[in-house]
């Protein structure tokens, strides 16, 4: 029997995803037409003998999360539960805190994955690889190749080329270590908790040695904060227990709002083989479709509109006559009036783009000439200026007719009256 754990973080995390995360927990943000974490759940549901999926995070349970979990259970026929941390405990602290729930039923192994990654999720090949490399006493990291410069932004893995054993692991090194990076997807045997317990005990000992701040009440919490990458993998490396399974499939982090459009492109391209029914096509009396496009069945799209490539249109969206949409995500209830143009943009829930308005951003795609290039997590500002990126319209934003919004972030509930360029509109 197998299980899976998906680490979904909490409201203090994912701040680079604002203003979109103001309205919905980041794991529920729709990417390629479905909530981000649903891609993980669907991949887990296809693993033979996987009986339960546990979501661990420190979001307060709410109606949106509960409703999503109920629907996902019914659709994928697998038990799904949400376990709420009392505080941010780190990637290792969360699973250690809920180790009894993870180990109940006696799973032979369990997957752990971060919610903010986009991947083909080669879980079954990882499982086969795990059985061939030690089984009950071994642990597997999913790795992929990055270029030398970008590898410094990730956990770097030095491995034995023959056995794939991890010999050395460094999280975000200061100098080049390896071009094999950690994808944030793992397969553990239950014995991993022995190693996490050692870190917990070490944290307790260090706290006792440095317990000069006795008035603080967070001492127990500090011992429970454990990071798999820095605290566990670094000590396991080189001891014949930690292995890397390298994938050549698509993979990306979803840290910023701009990376959601790139992730949507990757998932839409997968739909041609995994879910062709989700992709729209040009039909007589319908809009012109170019490339991979998802249109929710309840959306109203004028036949003269042109959509694609890489467009996702959400529930209840209205797309008027002559509208052009490319490389964009249009969220629930948005209205794009006649002849508006939306490029490299996320249009928020219930927002409105007026007639003949143009809303455009700058794509933050990986270098197309480098097969190992990843999407850069750009800082919001560079040299005092807003870094050109995709345009984001928050929830319930109104754009008037015949204006241009370029490379800007518009916070929720704003009614604009003129054009803006390279600005954050508060």
Swiss-Prot record:
It catalyses: alpha-D-mannose 1-phosphate + GTP + H(+) = GDP-alpha-D-mannose + diphosphate. InterPro entries: GMPPB_C (IPR056729), Hexapep_transf_CS (IPR018357), Mannose-1P_guanyltransferase (IPR050486), NTP_transferase_dom (IPR005835), Nucleotide-diphossugar_trans (IPR029044). The keyword GTP-binding applies. Keywords: GTP-binding, Nucleotide-binding, Nucleotidyltransferase, Transferase. GO terms for biological process: GDP-mannose biosynthetic process. GO terms for cellular component: cytoplasm. The keyword Nucleotidyltransferase applies. It is an enzyme of class 2 (transferase). Pfam families: GMPPB_C (PF25087), NTP_transferase (PF00483). Its EC number is 2.7.7.13. Belongs to the transferase hexapeptide repeat family. This is Mannose-1-phosphate guanyltransferase alpha-B. It comes from Xenopus laevis (African clawed frog).
